[in-house]
Amino acid sequence: MKFKLNKVGLIDHAEIELKSLTIICGENNTGKTYVTYALYGFLRSWRSILQDVLRNRIEERLKTGETPHIDLNQLFSGKINEYLTQLTKIYTSILPRVFAANAGFFSASTIVIKIDNERDFIPENYHRSIKDSPAGKTLATLSKEAGSPLLKVLVADDELVSRPFGGLTDFVSDAIADIVFAPYLPDTFIASAERTGAAIFRKELDFARTRMFQALGSLDAKELRNPFRLMEQMEAGYAWPVQDNVDFVRQLEDIDKITSSLAESHPELTKAFDAIIGGSYKVIKDKGLVYQPKGADKPRLSMSESSSSVRALLDIGFYLRCRAKAGDLLMIDEPELNLHPKNQRALARLIARLVNVGIKVFMTTHSDYLIKELNTLIMLNTRTPHTQAVQQAHGYENDELLDPARVCLFMTCTQNEKREGKGNRAKQNTLRQARIHTGFGIEVETFDTTIEDMNGIQSEILYGGDL
């Protein structure tokens, strides 16, 4: 899947392709966060946008025949990129909401998403029952047999069809999203760079309640009768990733009751995470969320009493333990936050293991330690007799090795704007893809240049004067 961004915040033009592991590096204030938030916002909102795009087409087909059905082949075969164009056009119009920014800041923005090859959805099997409550009566059934292009809709309660919101049309749209579009657009979780503050102040932060009180106070009696006006006024003053991080950590006591499919199938990965933080997160009755350091005699600590590294990894830890599943996209803004270089290396190895069990990872980083460790995992993947001996000597596992074909790294940079017949003009902020060598790993110029400058200065200090 390829993304093209134009005039999105500090990014003038950028093209990025998501692979199993996608990394963005670059200096401060060069647009990394704009790329990250823009991609996250689309992957967070595409299902609701798709409902608007498909509503009229679905309603037309539900009115035909005793057993209405949707011919998915007729609607979508060979047309996925056309629909993605419609989705991104609508999404671009809500970028100010995604970033909690002034609308004029994104007035010239465009985003394009394309896929190279469509997947065949005909072999997919699908079945979903819609009930009035978890144990209640069935209102409708949506089904698609493997080998058939037809999504059949059996309605037991006609009232469901006439609902303006949350009715049958929305359920059909969700089914189409699962069958046709979800293979390209993964469920996404983000850990923003503001996650440390969200962890320590999570009890004090309630965006939903704050927005409600502010909205109620700003509307008159007539406007309060309009639910859409109320929702409009309740828009948060925070970017979606920050807002979602806060909402997630505020629910940890409830989320803790769930075990993710990743934790069930690969418990060794949650153990590896616990080794990084030197303990584990626990929810204790009457005490709530605590951090339990490893060791029988160690006291339990609240989040305010815990180290910054424990707080920085809180949401990632609960995501892995309670939400993660194969096919997800995990986005991490600066995974190295508050981590000692030793733990940065350990986190790089955990990220590689996540990639190898089917979780895609997208991250921004300033950490040379993290990149060097990923390079080690790429170099060890050559599996020569020599590298296998090194792997065994230093305790690397086979499930930590990285296939370079599944990795891409982009660096923020500037380039001259090219205008036909007018020569080069103003500088543009963009992304440049790094070269990846099977035997040497990733070339990251943004780190290499700084390190070489420092080494040169120190060499001059040590060897440049009179002895």
Feature-to-residue mapping (PLM):
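P-loop NTPase switch/coupling surface
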Residues: 1-226, 355, 372, 378-400, ...
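Conserved ABC ATPase signature
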Residues: 27-28, 34, 282-345
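Extended hydrophobic secondary-structure segments that form protein cores and membrane-embedded regions
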Residues: 190-192, 401-413
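Polybasic, proline/glycine-rich intrinsically disordered low-complexity segments
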Residues: 224-246, 256
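Amphipathic alpha-helical domain-onset/packing element
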Residues: 258-280
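Loop/turn-to-beta-strand initiation segments
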Residues: 327-329, 358-362
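Helical segment within the ABC ATPase nucleotide-binding domain
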Residues: 345-356
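H-loop/switch region of ABC-family ATPase nucleotide-binding domains
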Residues: 364-366
